[in-house]
Amino acid sequence: MRVVLQKVNHAAVSIDDEVVGKIGLGYFLLVGFAPDDTEEKLNYLVHKITNLRVFEDENGKMNKGLRDVNGAILSVSQFTLYADTKHGNRPGFSQAASPEIAEPLYDLFNQKLAATGIPVETGHFGAMMKIDLENDGPTTIIYER
């Protein structure tokens, strides 16, 4: 499982020019799955992400988490995180989980994030989406489990 987390001032995801998810201050997540991903991996990453402290405190130190700043999460599925670019000029995606495996994991991941009490918005699994966001920092963290 791979997650690219970006700290944002705001983010929105649109499908066919219709906004389907948006947040203010928080984390924008790109989420990808491998065929062998498990609920245990989901639980680990949910804990890491929801307890991450990358928002500045009164001393300018990265010491506050999402709950401290009343932040939210925008989660978007992204199988291309498993792109293989070792050969040729076109990426291969054989290392990514099939939609039959990835979609239930993505849904469960988002449910577990929301169960922590942090507001969660999502894109639509498998859809062509447009993302509009404003990075803060920028701060980008890559999780792999």
From Swiss-Prot:
Q: What is its EC number?
A: 3.1.1.96
Q: Which GO terms describe its cellular component?
A: cytoplasm
UniProt xrefs under InterPro entries: Daa-tRNA_deacyls_DTD, DTD-like_sf
Q: Where in the cell is it found?
A: Cytoplasm
A single GO BP annotation from the record?
D-amino acid catabolic process
Q: What is the residue range of the motif Gly-cisPro motif, important for rejection of L-amino acids? A: 137-138
- Coiled-coil intervals, chain numbering: none
**One Pfam family hit:** Tyr_Deacylase
- SUPFAM superfamilies assigned to the protein according to its UniProt record, in alphabetical order: DTD-like (SSF69500)
User: Which reactions is this enzyme annotated as catalysing?
Assistant: glycyl-tRNA(Ala) + H2O = tRNA(Ala) + glycine + H(+); a D-aminoacyl-tRNA + H2O = a tRNA + a D-alpha-amino acid + H(+)
Q: Which domain of life is it from?
A: Bacteria
Q: Which GO MF terms are attached to this record?
A: D-tyrosyl-tRNA(Tyr) deacylase activity; Gly-tRNA(Ala) deacylase activity; Ser(Gly)-tRNA(Ala) hydrolase activity; tRNA binding
Entry keyword Acyltransferase? no
Q: What class of enzyme is it?
A: hydrolase
Q: Any idea which UniProt keywords this protein has?
A: Cytoplasm, Hydrolase, RNA-binding, tRNA-binding
Q: Which family does it belong to?
A: Belongs to the DTD family.
Q: How does it assemble?
A: Homodimer.
What domain notes does the record hold?
A Gly-cisPro motif from one monomer fits into the active site of the other monomer to allow specific chiral rejection of L-amino acids.
Could you tell me what this protein does? An aminoacyl-tRNA editing enzyme that deacylates mischarged D-aminoacyl-tRNAs. Also deacylates mischarged glycyl-tRNA(Ala), protecting cells against glycine mischarging by AlaRS. Acts via tRNA-based rather than protein-based catalysis; rejects L-amino acids rather than detecting D-amino acids in the active site. By recycling D-aminoacyl-tRNA to D-amino acids and free tRNA molecules, this enzyme counteracts the toxicity associated with the formation of D-aminoacyl-tRNA entities in vivo and helps enforce protein L-homochirality.
NCBIfam families the record matches: D-aminoacyl-tRNA deacylase (TIGR00256)
Name by which UniProt lists this protein: D-aminoacyl-tRNA deacylase
Gene of origin? dtd
